[in-house]
């Protein structure tokens, strides 16, 4: 639930502006943040009063205005600045971008669903629709979609509780706070106390969000069909079906509870990974109740010393990839709001609404592909990617260029060396796979994205972006070898984890014969 638990408390100083605070205060607050100055006194916050827009046309138009409209405003302001003095032009341009960032965050926050997820991703992944020189302004404002998006009024979400429990919330909980402490893309979270005194987090699904997500998925289907013009090998129908299936699962909190129970059992007592316990008796299709977790949010972790950020990054890396090999199951929703650094040094992993299970055969094919790339075997790599579904016709794809392309994208864990993950590195990887100007774009047009691989690539992209925000450094290759070849642990954390899984009797997918 963690994007759902990670939020500033109302009484904390220097909190981010919330929806409804005065426009001028919000602009000056963000400007002060960027320049390291104290903020002005905040205005009184308000809640989101309106309903979530639900129709396909309505949501598509609103999303287009939020994202596409800013490009038009950017161009117009830049043109007008030609006739102004440099200093005044710079100030006006900065103000325009601050206003646009505020509007974008507000609109995406009100829309919830997939639209809000786009905003969350843009807050930590460098994307093309944000002007590079003003990206910090947008990312700082959009980051509140991970931590404190506009919450719905208690009266509206209370109705969901009453419908799901068929009784008053006051009968179910000893107490429940009417003020949400977190608001995410599909639901918001309230602190509560059970009758036995246990502190819990109660995630309540927004009324109307199911219809909104149905519209988002339909709009995504249209975009995927258009994407075939750029990537003819893309099976748009299969990818759209996979997206729809994962979204429907995310809407079912009982399914999420089942996922979270699986991970919580597997990592119970783990030395550095923590997954909160689910209260199954109180969880419903639109209500999820878990143990409440305290911890430092990602923005605070980013300010820690390098060695602490490296440890945090390795823990996230081991959770994201390690669960594939130990559980044949991974969490695809890798964004910074889903991680909390606990007081004892463990990292709490939250929100299991979007996960993916893999077969032994799928994992072994991935191992084959990584092995071929690591051994510099172009023919073997092409064959492995063909078996995975990335290359439909091997005769149309040059094996040497394919190897070069794969090393550009996966070099960070294919090369046996210490590698710092930076935003520039991640942007370069994204460009070689999606930019029509890339030297490899003709190759990309001959490749495909198998529906079964969609969530894996989503996880990997999100993980990379998280590591880039941390500027985490490690020999990612040596850690990966622990799973691909069943090599001995390569770090102190790896040794602790190996002892844990051995003690618990949790094995992993058999590794390939080790090749050094």
Ranges and model annotations:
Residues 363:
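Short adenine-binding "F-helix/F-box" segment of the Bergerat
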